[in-house]
Amino acid sequence: RRWPSMGNRWLASIASRNGRERVELVDLRNGQPVPLPGINQADAQPISVSVSADGNRIALIRSREGRTELALYRRSVGILQRLPLEPAGVPREVSLDGSGRLLAVQVSRQGRWDVDLIRLP
């Protein structure tokens, strides 16, 4: 496992399973993985992951079809939504605050690193 992120009773990480890396969420009360339908896709490789305190939102950076992209997964509805970066850049690391409403993203633009703060609805 790598890129651990904790939110109250939740542990999100990137785990290797059957030769593939995938996002995994564990309920720390019982140590059991929680189903995440739609978050792990065959054509995508997770790079960084972060979970909100209530475990409902998971922010991730993944490589897909030669592009690196930022996405937000809402567990309550099972939806993975791509989040655009403005101005455009290559995301590398992500950190979601406890409320799941503010996202910090390390981004490379023209060879320079920066941190973007993104407010989420």
Q: Could you tell me what each predicted segment is?
A:
Residues 13-18, 59-65, 104-110:
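Beta-strand C-termini and the immediately following turn/loop, strongest in propeller blades
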Residues 8-9, 54-56, 99-101:
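Short coil/turn segments that connect the beta-strands within blades of beta-propeller domains
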Residues 37-43, 84-88:
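Surface loop/turn motifs at the tips and blade-to-blade linkers of beta-strand repeat domains
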Residues 95-121:
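Blade-level signature of beta-propeller repeat domains, shared across WD40, Kelch, NHL, RCC1
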Residues 1-16:
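Beta-strand-rich domains and repeat architectures in extracellular enzymes and scaffolds
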Residues 20-24, 66-71, 111-118:
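Structural motif
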